Amino acid sequence: MFEKTNRMNLLFDFYQELLTTKQKSYVSFYYLDDYSLGEIAEEFEVSRQAIYDNIKRTEESLEKYEEKLGMLRKYQQREKLFDQLEAQLTKKNFLDEQVKDTLEQLKNID
């Protein structure tokens, strides 16, 4: 469950602008704020089932966006490569402060 929550949070970070206001609200409450389905239903004055259905559809949408656009996958690949590069430079004692700063800037572009 923890892994799924982390994945949904990351997908939400990348694709939230593609969601409706209602989808953003429900997913934000559920995954980011850790509200229960009942608490969200009470907040929006709808049934628990309506919240559940909407969140499930939104999860499917987020996965479809990722399947087509691959933003999370590419981000994770870049992070892995940056970490490998940093480790290689450190191992060979090439990692001075200027190179370290440049790597950090590259990591933070997205």
Curated annotation (Swiss-Prot):
Species this protein is from:
Listeria innocua serovar 6a (strain ATCC BAA-680 / CLIP 11262)
What PANTHER family does this protein map onto?
UPF0122 PROTEIN CBO2450/CLC_2298, UPF0122 PROTEIN YLXM
Q: Which Pfam families match?
A: UPF0122
Family, per entry: Belongs to the UPF0122 family.
The residues forming a coiled coil are none
Protein name from the UniProt record: UPF0122 protein lin1916
InterPro entries, per this entry? RNA_pol_sigma_r3/r4-like, UPF0122, UPF0122_fam_protein, WH-like_DNA-bd_sf
**What top-level branch of life does the organism fall under?**
Bacteria
- Quote the Gene3D superfamilies the UniProt record gives: Winged helix-like DNA-binding domain superfamily/Winged helix DNA-binding domain
